[in-house]
């Protein structure tokens, strides 16, 4: 009989309950048709997971390279449990596609690590409009699930210093 590691250690299970979570979304407007579809799918799934409409804030920016700046500003407010980055970068005839894709992803990751705030990266990088159209609904919903799960994980792994500091004090 084999045992998995789960038999011997405490496991934090994925928590997709969005109740009481505050989620910020930064959506690029470049390739707007795809970006609006991404945000619509994301918001629809957030609502289905229990995040209230009042607890969702949507900010739009010109393009994918502007997403990290807006994420950083939202993270700095301390008002959010998680953030979502949404955009669509579609290959053209120049090297610009690689630059935008790589720099946007690096900036999103850096903001998440530096702020300690989970950020679901839903910036599509596709070869064609058709590829983007096929992916937007699933990617938007996946980002909603990812940000809710990671926000709950972050909350579960964050010590409650007030309780520890004030324990035993009257």
From Swiss-Prot:
Pathway: Cofactor biosynthesis; riboflavin biosynthesis; riboflavin from 2-hydroxy-3-oxobutyl phosphate and 5-amino-6-(D-ribitylamino)uracil: step 1/2
Pfam family, one: DMRL_synthase
Entry similarity comment: Belongs to the DMRL synthase family.
Residues the entry annotates as binding (2S)-2-hydroxy-3-oxobutyl phosphate: 93-94, 135
Protein name: 6,7-dimethyl-8-ribityllumazine synthase
GO MF entry, a single one: 6,7-dimethyl-8-ribityllumazine synthase activity
InterPro entries, per the entry: LS, LS/RS, LS/RS_sf
GO biological process, one term: riboflavin biosynthetic process
Keywords: Riboflavin biosynthesis, Transferase
EC number: 2.5.1.78
Active site as annotated: 96 (proton donor)
Organism: Polynucleobacter asymbioticus (strain DSM 18221 / CIP 109841 / QLW-P1DMWA-1) (Polynucleobacter necessarius subsp. asymbioticus)
Catalytic activity: (2S)-2-hydroxy-3-oxobutyl phosphate + 5-amino-6-(D-ribitylamino)uracil = 6,7-dimethyl-8-(1-D-ribityl)lumazine + phosphate + 2 H2O + H(+)
GO cellular component, one term: riboflavin synthase complex
Binding site residues for 5-amino-6-(D-ribitylamino)uracil: 30, 64-66, 88-90, 121
Function: Catalyzes the formation of 6,7-dimethyl-8-ribityllumazine by condensation of 5-amino-6-(D-ribitylamino)uracil with 3,4-dihydroxy-2-butanone 4-phosphate. This is the penultimate step in the biosynthesis of riboflavin.
């Amino acid at each position: 009989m084999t045992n998995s590691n789960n038999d011997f250690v405490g496991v934090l299970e994925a928590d997709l309950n969005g109740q009481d979570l505050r989620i910020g979304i930064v959506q690029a407007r470049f390739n707007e048709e795809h970006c609006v579809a991404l945000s619509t799918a994301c918001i629809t799934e957030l609502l289905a997971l229990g995040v209230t409409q009042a607890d969702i804030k949507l900010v739009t920016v010109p393009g994918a390279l502007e997403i990290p700046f807006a994420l950083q500003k939202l993270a700095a407010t301390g008002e959010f449990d998680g953030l979502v980055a949404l955009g669509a970068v579609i290959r053209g005839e120049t090297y610009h596609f690689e630059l935008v894709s790589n720099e946007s992803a690096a900036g999103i990751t850096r903001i998440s690590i530096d702020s300690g705030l989970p950020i679901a990266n839903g910036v599509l990088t596709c070869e064609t409009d058709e590829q983007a159209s096929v992916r937007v609904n699933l990617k938007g919903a996946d980002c909603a699930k990812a940000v809710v799960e990671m926000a709950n994980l972050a909350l579960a792994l964050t010590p409650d210093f007030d309780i520890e500091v004030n324990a035993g004090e009257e």
